[in-house]
A protein has these predicted regions:
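Surface-exposed, low-hydrophobicity beta-strand/loop segments enriched in small/polar/acidic residues
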Residues: 1-127
Length: 127
């Protein structure tokens, strides 16, 4: 595989560092700039061992603000709820870059924490 391959052209941006999230506030990311991407953009969700449940949803906005934000559903539909039966895994949510309004936010709703999680944005930049 050469560095000119499609995989070599991908950019990875850390949305959150690995965190033990005891509640929804701790499992929800800040707004991350996503306007410089083309094609499809993926959010990779790394989940360690959890003690309850974790529901993942996504918002997009044209500013890094909750005001005016709208929910966005990944291609293929919403992600399945993470439980103790399917934790310790990597999940991927894929979005058309054109559907993102410039920023993306991951909302992790924790039902009985903690949940060990990390989020990464992966895509090809336009420039």
């Amino acid at each position: 595989m050469s560095l000119a391959s499609p995989v070599g052209a991908l950019t990875r941006t850390k949305i959150t560092a690995c965190v033990s999230a005891a509640n929804t506030a701790a499992a929800t990311s800040a707004w991350t700039a996503a306007g410089a991407y083309e094609g499809e953009v993926a959010v990779e969700i790394s989940v360690g061992i959890i003690t309850g449940t974790l529901d993942l949803t996504f918002n997009t906005n044209d500013a890094a603000s909750d005001t005016g934000a709208t929910a966005i559903v990944p291609l293929g539909g919403a992600l399945a709820q993470v439980t103790t039966a399917n934790d310790d895994a990597i999940y991927t949510a894929v979005f058309p870059a054109t559907a993102l309004r410039g920023y993306i936010k991951v909302i992790g709703t924790v039902g009985t924490g903690p949940s060990l999680i990390a989020y990464t944005l992966i895509g090809r930049k336009k420039y």
